Amino acid sequence: ISSLIEKEAKSDQDKRLVSSVILNRLDNNLKLQVDATTIFSITKGKYKLKRDLNYQDLKNKDEYNTYFIRGLPPLPICYVNRKTIEILLENYKSEYLFYFFNEQVQKHIFSKTYKQHKKLLEEYRKNE
């Protein structure tokens, strides 16, 4: 879990919220749908994807692609900073189940419901 957080978030606060989303999704038996795992799967661990992810990427049948599998990948996807592990062990609580990274404001946007997530994503894409 900590390797997913490490790749998904940069700030400590975002790491707390991303960790809570991952734990909430695991608790609710939802697919994690973490982009970093899909990038890891496509690039075989190189992480240098010179384009945006697309729908076909998300359907990639690989044990590391959390859009395809349910639960965690078989192994970590990167080395983890000690601080990230400490943040995960805080077991930060939220009601969030979804998030995306807003490039314009350089931060993650979190939501509790799929309906809210979809609406926020649509607004973001209109302003791109």
Q: What spans do the regions from the language model cover?
A:
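Bacterial extracytoplasmic/cell-wall-associated proteins, especially those involved in peptidoglycan
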Residues: 1-128
